[in-house]
Amino acid sequence: MYDLHGETVHFDTEHNRLLLLDQTELPNKTVVLSLSRLEDMVEAIYNLRVRGAPAIGVAAAVGIAVLSNASAAKTITEFQTEFQKNAATLEKARPTAVNLSWAVNEMRKTQDANREAPIAVQKAALTARALELHAADIAVCRKIGEYGAALLQNCDAVLTHCNAGRLATVKYGTALAPVYVAKEQGHTMKVYADETRPLL
């Protein structure tokens, strides 16, 4: 089993792979996918193995970095052509996911800003940007949690609706982040989920 460090999406830079918690296997099994091929990344996004707009976006950014790092292109032109193909293919995997297009475009901007640089520099820039997007998602969700946890200090129960927990993002979730942070701070409460969205 791969260590996701409590995350749903993880960039294993040591082995240059995208690690995803396979949400189609939940709640019966915990399966972590190790992805390094474009077709496997597209399949994971298309078939809802990764769900939640923020998680999908970060998965695509990490996927682009993984594919770029694995490129055997000999010229900058070859590298850029390969990059554009990979970005376009991932973006089409789930056209309605706004964060997917946003993250792919962030990676395009990074590649474009470094288009004259040697391939190794472009790869490093894409890796750095994917790591930034990954870290930013965790930081934003954590901040939501910190602000919201203060509102829950005198609360015994919370009612939640929709998939806004940690499975929808890299780590903390959005609407449920305050519950996770409040728990970290030692506050316990009941959480009622009036809806689930299983894969049917």
Q: Which sequence ranges carry the predicted segments?
A:
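Positively charged, low-complexity intrinsically disordered leader regions
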Residues: 1-39, 43-46
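N-terminal active-site beta-alpha-beta segment that forms phosphate/nucleotide-binding
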Residues: 49, 53-200
